[in-house]
């Protein structure tokens, strides 16, 4: 009798959790996603460009735009004189012929460097050296691609670039064109406070919380402050992007963008699973698979 009561209690709790999850309010729809038609899904998201072109450069973005990708992804830091520039790392060492911390350099110093210097596919030829490729400003990105959907990842943690980034987005009327992610939870919270009208992706801790609560069927208890989850397939060997994860996210009206997928068989697998976007260095392969 006791065992039966325990089982009944467990069943009722499980049912209650499931009902709470199903009844949970979805995230409000954001106008950022209105720029995509149903036929565009999954979105072809051009990862900053390291495999085919010099990363985070206007040259790379121009090549991807010519391929008619759906979204241009880029990374941003801020210079010592307050200019927001496209670059992945904290320093210029890995991608240019210079050295130094971006936040300690002026825009003039940053843009004097060759951003095509270290790009190579075979460690022998460096075809972009001396071609006039520089580190661009985000302002240049907005002026060059005013009608393109963008994902602008905040890489710099300190000093905060939330307010300057928000000001620039508003200046160019990109509030419904830009989606802002950051691995750093403090950075993304600062941006949301400064720019509540712009769509954001979940920070690292928010992703972990969503995964854990979803696994425990408590996904409906999360108060959502984000419109998208941008995640790898696994984190520390633990699967993240599963069909159940996608169901939880879509049930809350949250899109799932997976990164960084460059192999055709993996692309096909995630297309079949129903992800909303695939971030890739090989947009050419993904577009071919999608028949575009």
Language-model regions, residue ranges each:
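C-terminal helical cap(s) of enzyme catalytic domains, especially alpha/beta-barrels
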Residues: 283-292
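Short, acidic/polar
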Residues: 53-63, 134-138, 207-220, 262-269
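Hydrophobic faces of well-ordered beta-strands that scaffold small-molecule active sites
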Residues: 44-47, 72-74, 150-152, 178-181, ...
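Short extracytoplasmic
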Residues: 38-71
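Catalytic domains of carbohydrate-active enzymes, especially glycoside hydrolases
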Residues: 60-78, 144, 222-226
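Active-site beta-loop-alpha junctions enriched in small/polar residues
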Residues: 49, 77, 90, 155-157, ...
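Catalytic cores of alpha/beta
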Residues: 189, 263-276
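Metal-dependent phosphodiesterase/phospholipase catalytic core, i.e.
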Residues: 5, 10-16, 20-33, 40-41, ...
